[in-house]
Swiss-Prot record:
It catalyses: urea + 2 H2O + H(+) = hydrogencarbonate + 2 NH4(+). InterPro entries: Urease_beta-like, Urease_betasu_sf, Urease_subunit. Pathway: Nitrogen metabolism; urea degradation; CO(2) and NH(3) from urea (urease route): step 1/1. Pfam families: Urease_beta. The keyword Cytoplasm applies. The keyword Iron-sulfur does not apply. One of its GO terms (cellular component) is urease complex. NCBIfam families: PRK13203.1 (NF009682), urease_beta (TIGR00192). It is found in: Cytoplasm. This is Urease subunit beta. Keywords: Cytoplasm, Hydrolase.
Length: 126
């Protein structure tokens, strides 16, 4: 390790203490079941309402939210598995494009997002 005046290329220094991810953002916990026959992996920044249609949960709770896990990580749901996950609200301009094409704009268009999910056979849509 280098002294305090120089940093060796590739070196990093870690501060003391814990890092709280998504500090100050609203969080909620939901139960999710994998009703499919294959494992499903969901990345840290995926708009949760748009995840694989074989995951069963209250899709309305997933609108405008993502997994509350460190950036670059993922949660894995094995077939038949049910587990609780914590979601946190999306930041930025709260617009989502692509993924499963349920949103393609503002996450505030909740009725339209749920209508598309229902039409496409997503589980967990009332």
């Amino acid at each position: 390790m280098s002294n305090n005046n120089y940093i060796v290329p590739g070196e990093y220094r870690v501060a003391e203490g814990e890092i709280e991810i998504n500090a100050g953002r609203e969080k909620t916990t939901i139960r999710v079941s994998n009703t499919g026959d294959r494992p499903i992996q969901v990345g840290s920044h995926i708009h949760f309402v748009e995840v694989n249609k074989e995951l069963l949960f209250d899709r309305a709770e997933g609108i405008g939210r993502r997994l509350n896990i460190p950036s670059g990580t993922a949660a894995r749901f094995e077939p038949g598995e049910e587990m609780e996950v914590e979601l946190t609200e999306l930041g930025g301009n709260r617009e989502v494009f692509g993924i499963s094409d349920l949103t393609n704009g503002s996450v505030d268009n909740k009725e339209l997002i749920l209508q598309r999910a229902k039409e496409l056979g997503y589980k967990g849509v009332e």
